[in-house]
């Protein structure tokens, strides 16, 4: 459904739902200031047509780093700036550890799974997931070994193209997905596997749709738009198809389950289900399993692959940066072995470039919504229990109080005067606090090895001149996606 039709529908039926909204429970407490809302419509008139992110950044200029907006009929507290976000998610971590609702995903996830659960369910699932992923990441085949094996497959695959022009989207999706698949499903897939490619396409479609303006309008008025056609229906359809695959995989795991040798996340979860089958209140049931696997598969694939796509688009835009990275690679690693994680500390410029790519790309500008778990005093305001809170991660990644030129790509943001890697409290691409991304460590390891392995083995070329390359994202709502592009990977000859 087109955005204009959605908005017309909103205004047309708004007065009907205004009657229903009068029955909603009134909030107590003292929320931060913000623009005056209209009944039911909330702050729709203050929303920028270019999306929620642009709207929030404009409101920050007027109201400061903490303010309230009404997304349709519901109040949401917006947190901007590094210090404010860290004050909430780190200093008052427990109070802000609840998970808010993502309307376009809720019909499928319904508060299940490690990412979208709340309360004891979330604590139990997160503890289990952290331990399980750590065990499979640090066991006989560590995550580093898995990534290095995948990097070798990647290099061999790119060499098959012999420098021909290609769109790197599919292959970057494949390598990222194979790492999380090896941990969750216990297997990797061939890059040409049709079922695998179908799953990756569904993930890519869904991530793109979530960043669309229509999806953002749905977040405002999901209460009645859910009854009409729109992007939310397509998102649910896509996710259900992925869930069907996960269900099938779970049944295969169940049929071959060996209690003595669990080989992946699903096996380990099934064993825990069996152990707790007499507990009628257990959180280890089928629904939490499949939604947890869906969440890990989705986030473990799309964020890393999109970062890699941005990485090489940026390198095409700034070829002098790529050349400087390659010089460091040649000095530290050479050409006769793959990069290892131990190399990272000896390669501060490369590490700084990867940090700056993540900062500049800003893939998830509006972090997943939080919810306060109790009535909470925050910076002089009283947030009632269950108040939704949006941390605007983009406002930290582009915080002028921490980065001299926040809107410019500059690896020097992460280097001190001695050329050593410089940490920054504003570096929050994975959020922070108790809800920080489960796979942060794995993702950082993937980015270093994949990025370095490619530049070790290939020079880059584009049919577009560097000055004409556009780094602007397609969407700038709850996700940012680079425009599709073509690239040559040309084999390097290094002595």
UniProtKB/Swiss-Prot annotation:
InterPro entries: Cyt_P450 (IPR001128), Cyt_P450_CS (IPR017972), Cyt_P450_E_grp-I (IPR002401), Cyt_P450_E_grp-I_CYP2B-like (IPR008068), Cyt_P450_sf (IPR036396), Cytochrome_P450_fam2 (IPR050182)
The protein's name in its UniProt record: Cytochrome P450 2B15
Predominant location category: endoplasmic reticulum
A GO molecular function held by the record: heme binding
Cofactors that this protein relies on: heme
The reaction(s) this protein catalyses: an organic molecule + reduced [NADPH--hemoprotein reductase] + O2 = an alcohol + oxidized [NADPH--hemoprotein reductase] + H2O + H(+)
EC number of this enzyme: 1.14.14.1
Biological source species: Rattus norvegicus
Subcellular location, record wording: Endoplasmic reticulum membrane; Microsome membrane
List of residues that carry Phosphoserine: 129
Binding site for heme: 437
Gene: Cyp2b15
The protein's role, per its UniProt record: Cytochromes P450 are a group of heme-thiolate monooxygenases. In liver microsomes, this enzyme is involved in an NADPH-dependent electron transport pathway. It oxidizes a variety of structurally unrelated compounds, including steroids, fatty acids, and xenobiotics.
GO biological process: epoxygenase P450 pathway; xenobiotic metabolic process
Source species, domain of life: Eukaryota
Xref: Gene3D superfamilies: Cytochrome P450 (1.10.630.10)
Family: Belongs to the cytochrome P450 family.
């Amino acid at each position: 459904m087109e955005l204009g039709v959605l908005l017309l529908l909103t205004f047309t039926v708004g007065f009907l739902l205004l009657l229903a909204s009068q029955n909603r429970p009134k909030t107590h407490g003292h929320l931060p200031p913000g623009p005056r809302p209209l009944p039911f419509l909330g702050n729709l008139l203050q929303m920028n047509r270019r999306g929620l992110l642009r709207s929030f950044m404009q409101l920050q200029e007027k109201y400061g780093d903490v303010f309230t907006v009404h997304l349709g009929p519901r109040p949401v507290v917006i947190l901007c700036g590094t210090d404010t976000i860290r004050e909430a998610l780190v200093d008052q971590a427990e109070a802000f550890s609840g998970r808010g609702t993502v309307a376009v995903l809720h019909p499928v996830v319904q508060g299940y799974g490690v990412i979208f659960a709340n309360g004891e369910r979330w604590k139990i699932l997160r503890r289990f997931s952290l331990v399980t992923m750590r065990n499979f990441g640090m066991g006989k085949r560590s995550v580093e070994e898995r990534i290095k094996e995948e990097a070798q497959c990647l290099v061999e695959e790119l060499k098959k193209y012999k420098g021909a022009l290609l769109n790197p989207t599919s292959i970057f999706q494949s390598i990222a997905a194979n790492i999380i698949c090896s941990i969750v499903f216990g297997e990797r897939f061939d890059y040409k596997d049709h079922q695998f490619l179908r799953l990756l396409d569904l993930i890519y479609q869904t991530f793109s749709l979530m960043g669309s303006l229509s999806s953002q309008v749905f977040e405002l008025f999901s209460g009645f738009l859910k009854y009409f056609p729109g992007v939310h229906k397509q998102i649910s359809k896509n996710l259900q198809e992925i869930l069907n695959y996960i269900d099938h995989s779970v049944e295969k795991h169940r049929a071959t389950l060996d209690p003595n040798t669990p080989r992946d996340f699903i096996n380990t979860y099934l064993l825990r289900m069996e152990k707790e089958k007499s507990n009628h209140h257990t959180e280890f049931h089928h629904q939490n399993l499949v939604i947890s696997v869906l969440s890990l598969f989705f986030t473990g694939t799309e964020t890393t692959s999109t970062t890699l796509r941005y990485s090489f688009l940026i390198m095409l835009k700034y070829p002098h940066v790529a050349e400087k990275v390659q010089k460091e690679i040649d000095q530290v690693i050479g050409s006769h072995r793959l990069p290892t994680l131990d190399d990272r500390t000896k390669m501060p410029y490369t590490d700084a470039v990867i940090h700056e790519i993540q900062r500049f790309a800003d893939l998830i500008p509006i972090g997943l919504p939080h919810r306060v778990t109790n009535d909470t005093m925050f910076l002089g305001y009283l947030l009632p229990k269950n108040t939704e809170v949006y941390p605007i991660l983009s406002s930290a990644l582009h915080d002028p109080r921490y980065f001299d030129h926040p809107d410019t790509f500059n690896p020097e943001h992460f280097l001190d005067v001695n050329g050593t890697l410089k940490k920054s409290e504003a570096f929050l691409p994975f959020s922070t606090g108790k809800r920080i991304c489960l796979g942060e460590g794995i993702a950082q390891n993937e980015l270093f090895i994949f990025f370095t392995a490619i530049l070790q083995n290939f020079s880059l070329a584009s049919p577009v001149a560097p000055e004409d390359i556009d780094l602007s994202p397609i969407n700038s709502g709850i996700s940012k996606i680079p425009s599709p592009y073509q690239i040559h990977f040309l084999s390097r000859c290094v002595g």
